[in-house]
């Protein structure tokens, strides 16, 4: 006896991200592998090391939003100098080409003091980073949200969560998106998440790793489906490096690009 339409199980709609990855494997075989290998040949292999404690990483990432890394680093150093803490100094690990070169070894700021600072004082302290009038209240609101949820400003508890659980916890905080959360989790904990900034997005679209209309926010999840966990960190570092060094927004240096043979920006018919 046939089931009535009302009792038939509805077929699940195909996952568009998984469908894209399968299509990519079918129509452009080995594109992902060739991209990873080409980038590694140019920029090397990278093992994860913690750059900063997670709260410092979060605040630094907020400071970098719509600002040059060098300016954001000056603002972070100003926080350290103005609101010193008595915590032990940490050894700073500068990243291979993703920023952080302007930071020194040292203790994180006193986050209680940063949260409680008069707003105009905090604006003046982080002014070197740019957009201080917008970022100062955002920093305090973020610190307040963390403290009210956890009792202090530490984010070390995120290490006990899965990458997606930790990302969801962070993105529930007003003003924190997938990119900011993924930067923190990748650099502070080595979690296999891709933080899609403008460099990663540009390279990904030009090579054809993600759909032409995919947004940066959507691209985070394309990479989760596309890469193995042990590939994510190195791919992240090298994509950022490539976007900064060769695949510029204007006048990309095609003649020295390690991805040239497979880049649809160079040749729309590239295999």
Task: Set out the residue ranges of the language-model regions.
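Mixed-charge, low-complexity intrinsically disordered regions
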Residues: 1-15
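Catalytic cores of DNA base-excision repair glycosylases
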Residues: 15-271
């Amino acid at each position: 006896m046939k089931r009535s339409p009302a009792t038939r199980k509805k077929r699940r709609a195909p996952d568009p991200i998984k469908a894209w990855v399968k299509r990519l494997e079918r129509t452009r075989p080995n594109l992902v592998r060739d991209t990873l290998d080409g980038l590694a040949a140019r920029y090397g292999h990278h093992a994860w090391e913690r750059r900063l404690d997670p709260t410092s990483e979060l605040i630094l990432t907020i400071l970098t939003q719509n600002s040059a890394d060098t300016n954001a680093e000056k603002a972070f150093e100003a926080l350290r100098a103005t609101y010193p803490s008595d915590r032990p100094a940490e050894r700073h690990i500068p990243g291979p080409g993703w920023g952080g070169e302007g930071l020194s070894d040292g203790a994180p700021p006193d986050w209680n003091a940063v949260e409680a600072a008069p707003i105009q004082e905090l604006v003046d302290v982080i002014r070197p980073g740019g957009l201080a009038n917008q970022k100062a209240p955002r920093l305090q609101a973020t610190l307040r949200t963390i403290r009210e949820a956890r009792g202090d400003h530490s984010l070390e508890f995120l290490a006990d969560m899965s990458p997606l659980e930790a990302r969801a916890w962070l993105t529930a905080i007003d003003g924190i998106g997938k990119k900011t959360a993924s930067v923190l989790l990748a650099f502070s904990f080595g979690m296999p998440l891709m933080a899609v900034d403008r460099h990663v997005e540009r390279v990904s679209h030009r090579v054809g790793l993600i759909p032409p209309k995919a947004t940066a926010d959507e691209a985070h999840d394309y990479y989760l489906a596309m890469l193995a966990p042990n590939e994510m960190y190195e791919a992240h570092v090298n994509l950022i490096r490539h976007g900064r060094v060769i695949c510029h927004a204007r006048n990309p240096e095609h003649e020295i690009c390690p991805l040239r043979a497979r880049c649809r920006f160079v040749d729309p018919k590239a295999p």
